[in-house]
């Protein structure tokens, strides 16, 4: 069995796609940061290793993060270059602008789905979160055909609600669903 993906074409069920977050998540480690040239060299090394998807950064986080994602999108060939964004329209637009020049691009958008996060972090009701899922994926699709959606704090989410969120993301056009075991 296989399926068709906008950035990978027809994919066999046994194909493992390597998704690397070093440039985004690795930068959150205390005492570890890279300048622009180091980030580009790291992205080029990941491409040389055969990494399929590089999450290059969180473009809305800072002008420096935007610039590094943009430069990686312009220079690194081969892997899908991804910009991370919350479900906020400004985040998604900024990510879309940052990855514009990539030969293969993706926006990875997320929102918290657990009762705890919805109540205290987002201050949203579940139906509002579902609306954000749909709207965020729909907006991201205006910048790229390849959109990844993630449920932040998904492991503490009611399974029925999580399935509704996944269904909403797929219906809105998400091509990759990410259900992590840890927080983003």
Model-found features: residue ranges?
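Active-site beta->alpha loop and helix N-cap motifs at the rims of alpha/beta catalytic domains
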Residues: 79-147, 155-161
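N-terminal capping/small domains of soluble enzymes
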Residues: 1-89
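Distinct, well-ordered alpha-helical segments
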Residues: 65-73, 92-98, 157-169
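Conserved, mostly hydrophobic/aromatic
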Residues: 26, 46, 107, 149, ...
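Short amphipathic alpha-helices and their capping/turn segments at secondary-structure boundaries
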Residues: 2-10, 91-102, 167
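Conserved small/polar residues in nucleotide/adenosyl-binding loops
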Residues: 182-184
């Amino acid at each position: 069995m296989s399926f068709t993906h906008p950035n990978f074409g027809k994919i066999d069920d046994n194909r493992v796609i390597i998704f690397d977050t070093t440039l985004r998540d690795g930068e959150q480690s205390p005492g570890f940061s890279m300048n622009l040239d180091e980030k580009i060299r790291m992205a080029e090394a990941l491409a040389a290793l055969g990494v399929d998807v590089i999450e290059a950064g969180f473009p809305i986080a800072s002008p420096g993060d935007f610039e590094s994602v943009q430069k990686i999108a312009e220079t690194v060939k081969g892997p899908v270059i991804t910009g991370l964004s919350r479900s906020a329209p400004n985040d998604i637009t900024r990510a879309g602008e940052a990855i514009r020049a990539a030969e293969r691009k993706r926006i990875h958008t997320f929102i918290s789905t657990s009762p705890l996060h919805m109540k205290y972090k987002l201050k949203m009701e579940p139906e509002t979160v579902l609306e954000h899922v749909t709207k965020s994926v729909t907006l991201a699709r205006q910048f790229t055909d390849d959109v990844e959606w993630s449920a932040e704090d998904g492991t503490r989410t009611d399974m029925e609600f999580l399935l509704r969120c996944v269904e909403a993301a797929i219906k809105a056009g998400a091509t990759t669903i990410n259900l992590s075991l840890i927080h983003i």
